[in-house]
């Protein structure tokens, strides 16, 4: 892939969306993971200024992720704010009857998105998305949480392609080497949740997207079954609510 042209196209897209909305800039959640780090880097290239990052750890968030996010803010000279959301999460735990790890992870994602939209209004800026194509196809995210945004410059790149672009843009090796994780609970791992590496997942997704029967026959049947199941079960996450026409 021509990463120079792709980078230019993404930067043009960011500039266009901000200009057409008459916004001042963008707001993003910076987790310390590779996706948000890549988007922050693209935003800085595109806009030069008015890129505001919110770092929103919980008590169990990986400290290394916060350190990496802070280093990136320093490297890019980003305006940022740290908001620890544990007290908000604790209030939910006291009131809720559903406190499974998944439920708490989803609620934490929605807390973060609420804060992002609050700051987007405060700064007259757009919330920019950080989900990649692999996550979007699988519905691997929280509806009205990390999936919510005004626009998304990286949603057409598979996770494996995110790594390639990150290397091209010389992101710090910490982002490239760390295991992918939404950091929703302690020691949470995307690939452990999904049961396969992103390399295999992306291979399967591409085969399904192009309906490459020859390639599909060579892939692990359990991988293809998992992908089809998640894509079908979570398809609603990528759609606007249906409205009855009278």
Curated annotation (Swiss-Prot):
Positions of Mg(2+) binding: 35, 135
Residues engaged in binding deamido-NAD(+): 110
Record-listed E.C. numbers: 6.3.1.5
Enzyme class name: ligase
Gene3D superfamilies tied to this protein: HUPs
Pathway: Cofactor biosynthesis; NAD(+) biosynthesis; NAD(+) from deamido-NAD(+) (ammonia route): step 1/1
A family per Pfam: NAD_synthase
Binding sites annotated in the UniProt record for ATP: 29-36, 130, 159, 181
Keyword NADP: no
Gene Ontology CC annotations of this record: cytoplasm
UniProt entry keywords in alphabetical sequence: ATP-binding, Ligase, Magnesium, Metal-binding, NAD, Nucleotide-binding
One BP annotation, GO: NAD biosynthetic process
GO function terms (MF aspect): ATP binding; glutaminase activity; metal ion binding; NAD+ synthase (glutamine-hydrolyzing) activity; NAD+ synthase activity
Reactions the enzyme catalyzes: deamido-NAD(+) + NH4(+) + ATP = AMP + diphosphate + NAD(+) + H(+)
General function of this protein: Catalyzes the ATP-dependent amidation of deamido-NAD to form NAD. Uses ammonia as a nitrogen source.
Family membership: Belongs to the NAD synthetase family.
Self-association state and partner proteins as the record states: Homodimer.
Stated name of the protein: NH(3)-dependent NAD(+) synthetase
Organism of this sequence: Campylobacter jejuni subsp. jejuni serotype O:2 (strain ATCC 700819 / NCTC 11168)
């Amino acid at each position: 892939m021509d990463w120079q042209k792709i980078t230019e196209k993404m930067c043009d897209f960011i500039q266009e969306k901000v200009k057409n909305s008459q916004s001042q800039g963008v707001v993003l959640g910076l987790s310390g993971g590779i996706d948000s780090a890549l988007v922050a880097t693209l935003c800085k290239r595109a806009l030069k200024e008015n890129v505001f990052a919110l770092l929103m750890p919980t008590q169990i968030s990986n400290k290394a992720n916060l350190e990496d996010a802070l280093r990136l803010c320093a490297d890019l000279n980003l305006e940022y704010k740290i908001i620890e959301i544990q007290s908000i999460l604790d209030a939910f735990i006291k009131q809720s009857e559903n406190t499974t790890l998944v439920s708490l992870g989803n609620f934490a994602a929605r807390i973060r998105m609420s804060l992002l939209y609050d700051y987007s209004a405060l700064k007259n800026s757009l919330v920019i998305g950080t989900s990649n194509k692999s996550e979007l196809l699988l519905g691997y995210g929280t509806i009205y949480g990390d999936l919510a945004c005004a626009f998304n410059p990286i949603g057409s790149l598979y996770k494996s392609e995110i790594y390639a672009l990150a290397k091209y843009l010389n992101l710090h090796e910490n982002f490239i080497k760390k295991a992918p994780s939404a950091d929703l609970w302690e020691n949470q791992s995307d690939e452990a949740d999904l049961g396969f590496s992103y390399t295999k997942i992306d291979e399967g997704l591409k085969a399904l997207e192009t309906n490459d029967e020859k390639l599909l026959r060579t892939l692990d049947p359990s991988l293809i079954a998992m992908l089809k199941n998640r894509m079908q079960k979570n398809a609603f996450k990528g759609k606007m609510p249906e409205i009855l026409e009278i």
